[in-house]
Each structure stands twice: as structure tokens, then as C-alpha cells.
């Protein structure tokens, strides 16, 4: 019997919290701007 590992999918992750998904909305752009000013190496997933 196989068990569900609840691993998640990369496509869903990119579509919801990827860079292009962030740039699509005003608040998403604010997220990118905040992470840039903080000096984050990774701006989005």
C-alpha cells in the first residue's frame, strides 16, 4: 500500500509564488521590491 508523502508539485509552486506570478500583481511587486531592498539572494521561488 502506497502512502501519500504530501511532497507538493513544482508547477503549483511556480504558478503561485514564482517570480512571474509575483510581478503580475501590485502586491507581488511590493514583495519583490522588499526582498530586493533587504538583499535577499533569492527573490522568488
UniProtKB/Swiss-Prot annotation:
Q: Which organism is it from?
A: Synechocystis sp. (strain ATCC 27184 / PCC 6803 / Kazusa)
Per the record, the similarity remark reads: Belongs to the bacterial ribosomal protein bL34 family.
**InterPro entries per UniProt:** Ribosomal_bL34
Q: Where is the composition biased (Polar residues)?
A: 1-10
What ranges does the record give for the region Disordered, renumbered to this chain?
Answer: 1-45
The source's superkingdom equals Bacteria
Compositionally skewed regions (Basic residues) per UniProt: 11-45
Q: Which GO terms describe its cellular component?
A: ribonucleoprotein complex; ribosome
Gene Ontology biological process: translation
The gene name on file is: rpmH
One annotated GO molecular function = structural constituent of ribosome
Which named protein is this?
Large ribosomal subunit protein bL34
Q: Which UniProt keywords apply?
A: Ribonucleoprotein, Ribosomal protein
* Pfam families per UniProt: Ribosomal_L34
Amino acid at each position: 500500500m502506497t502512502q501519500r508523502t504530501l511532497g507538493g508539485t513544482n508547477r503549483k509552486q511556480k504558478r503561485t509564488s514564482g517570480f512571474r506570478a509575483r510581478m503580475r500583481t501590485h502586491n507581488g511587486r511590493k514583495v519583490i521590491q522588499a526582498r530586493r531592498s533587504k538583499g535577499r539572494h533569492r527573490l522568488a521561488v
